[in-house]
Amino acid sequence: MKINSPLEAYKYLPQTNCGECGEATCMAFASKLIDRSGKTSDCPPLIKEKKFAKKLAELDRLLAPEIRQVTIGVGEKAVNIGGDDVLYRHKLTFFNKTKMFFDVADNMDEAALVERVNSIANFRKFYVGRNLLLDGVAIRAVSNDPAKFAAAVKKVAEAGLPMIFCSFNPAVLKAGLEAAKDLKPLLYAANKDNWKEVGELAIEYKVPVVVSAFNDLDALKTLAKTYAEAGIKDIVLDPGTYPTGKGLKDTFTNFLKIRRAGIMGDTEIAYPIMALPFTAWMAGIADPVSASYWETVMASVFTIRYGDIMILHSLEPYATLPEVHLAETIYTDPRTPVSVDGGMYKVGSPTADSPVLFTTNFALTYYTVESDISSNGIDCWLLAVDTDGIGVEAAVAGGQLTADKVKDAFDKAGFDLKTAVNHNTVVTPGLAARLQGDLEDKLGANVKVGPMDSGRIPGWMEKNWPPK
């Protein structure tokens, strides 16, 4: 993105404040364009009226991310990769979390193939208010047989996940594309030997393609430039992923060089980067647990350092959980704390005799408290106070959590302590103990100070509930 101020974007908008974009003013819409929560296509006059055509083209150019965004797949499960504008998250944020595709082989028994694909498609891990998922399937043409590969593609496509077709044989890739028309898979890969044929497939079927040159950035850039000049825009870079030793060091360095060059304005190499942690299984590690461990280490390294998409093998929980957790953490937007909606929540099946607790709406705090309560079978009312997504201790210190705000939260939730429960008592977090007196005055209720750590709530309840 070459502009970073709403005022700069505003110059290219109709400036009529028509409201068709859903915002009251064009300036408000310009702000959405800058923080990438809105798109130029959301402004009907800008799109439909010919007099704005030049402004639209220029605005799209200025708003385009430094690293091209590439879409793989179609529909709700399609994934975007790339699209970043900075080298370091604190300067803005990272967009489009690293996408994790897991491999299958086209020579697998059908039952085993279906079972593995279902394992990928059905993976769910609830984490801080959302389900973490695996992103897609990479189909490796181990057989090098076009017919067998096409059959595997048809079977995998039934899961509805985005796909990567892995073969250096253009005939195999073409068979896969015929079996998955209009599903927009990613082709892996074009190299110095097959670039012409694979490029023709990418143009004919309008699909994204990986260009590959192991540890040769000059060749990689040449391939990408050649494809761009041929009209292929959706390109992914594979500089090679070596699993150990100097090769791994070179891989790490190459990722840094590519991304730095792209962010600094070298458009010929400003594309998403593919990492291949599954090469850990080719490093001669006999023990599958150790191989899986090393694959996870590699995935972690390249999640942190600019891997936009990766192909992995191990589906063991000890491998997938750290991989998806790390990606979720690295791609959390530092500009906006992760939060839940403020309001009153039921934990279990609370009654008029159940305890009433409150915490802040910082997602990690809320879900930790909720989990500690529900996992111990405690039915209660849990109020999330809107503190702009800040945790209890910091919110108390910064004034985002006060007695007035707690009272407002109860009022907005329509929860009257005098009538909704029989005990007229509320439990405050231990880290908010200083609010006890003010809360009693504001709420007209009995306020008990709970434990400092929500993990101690069950023991605290045994000693202090019901109130005497």
Curated annotation (Swiss-Prot):
Q: What pathway, per the record?
A: One-carbon metabolism; methanogenesis from acetate
Q: Which gene encodes it?
A: cdhE1
Which reaction equations make up its catalytic activity? 5,6,7,8-tetrahydrosarcinapterin + methyl-Co(III)-[corrinoid Fe-S protein] = 5-methyltetrahydrosarcinapterin + Co(I)-[corrinoid Fe-S protein] + H(+)
Q: Which residues form the 4Fe-4S domain?
A: 1-60
- Record text on cofactor binding: Binds 1 [4Fe-4S] cluster.
Function, as annotated, reads: Part of a complex that catalyzes the reversible cleavage of acetyl-CoA, allowing growth on acetate as sole source of carbon and energy.
Enzyme Commission number, as recorded:
2.1.1.245
Q: Which source organism does the UniProt entry give?
A: Methanosarcina acetivorans (strain ATCC 35395 / DSM 2834 / JCM 12185 / C2A)
Protein name, UniProt field:
Acetyl-CoA decarbonylase/synthase complex subunit gamma
